């Protein structure tokens, strides 16, 4: 009875996280990611002389670059919060596989039933998904700060391109918030 309750209780946050990833990440990238955008490289490339980039790319690629710039700036301005977000991502990467290994070994030595092992794996995955979603807010705030700077710099001649790039940057953050085991399932 308890494993079934845990299965149901774990399925809800997993389904909610997958739905949020699709709605705020995958759907937005599908709608806006293919848009060809043109930027002014003198305003787009940061002062530290990053690798040379193309002036014409898709909104998907510019969004990815904007997110990476935002994360780098965030690392400099608030390293404690950035490390916390990175730790939550590592938690989501490590906990489901480790719980799977422990559950399989527990089944092999006949300490828990198979249904209990499946429930434990799903519970660990649900916990990882919840931690990933809850720790996403500071990253989105960092992307918002970078987007504000992007708007002030007027890196994109067309406002529509700029908005598509910002939406794609936010979508990349949502896309990468799930634990990798769920990201493999939810392509």
Task: Say what each PLM segment does.
Residues 114-144:
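Alpha-helical transmembrane segments and their immediate juxtamembrane interface regions
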Residues 1-11, 109-124:
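Hydrophobic alpha-helical transmembrane segments
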Residues 2-95, 133-187:
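Polar-ligand-bearing catalytic/cofactor-coordination segments
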Residues 89-111, 119-129:
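Alpha-helical transmembrane segments and their immediate juxtamembrane boundary regions
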């Amino acid at each position: 009875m308890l494993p079934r309750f845990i299965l149901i209780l774990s399925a809800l946050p997993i389904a909610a996280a997958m739905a949020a990833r699709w709605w705020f990440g995958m759907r937005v990238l599908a709608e806006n990611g293919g848009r060809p955008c043109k930027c002014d490289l003198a305003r787009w490339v940061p002062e530290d002389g990053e690798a040379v980039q193309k002036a014409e790319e898709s909104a998907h690629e510019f969004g990815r670059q904007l997110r990476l710039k935002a994360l780098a700036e965030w690392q400099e301005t608030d390293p404690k919060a950035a490390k916390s977000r990175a730790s939550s991502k590592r938690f989501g990467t490590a906990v489901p596989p480790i719980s799977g290994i422990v559950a399989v070994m527990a089944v092999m030595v006949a300490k828990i039933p198979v249904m209990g092992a499946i429930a434990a794996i799903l519970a660990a995955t649900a916990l990882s998904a919840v931690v990933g979603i809850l720790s996403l807010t500071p990253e989105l705030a960092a992307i918002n700060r970078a987007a504000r700077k992007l708007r002030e710099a007027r890196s994109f001649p067309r406002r529509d391109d700029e908005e598509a790039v910002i939406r794609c940057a936010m979508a990349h953050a949502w896309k990468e918030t799930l634990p990798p085991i769920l990201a493999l399932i939810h392509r």
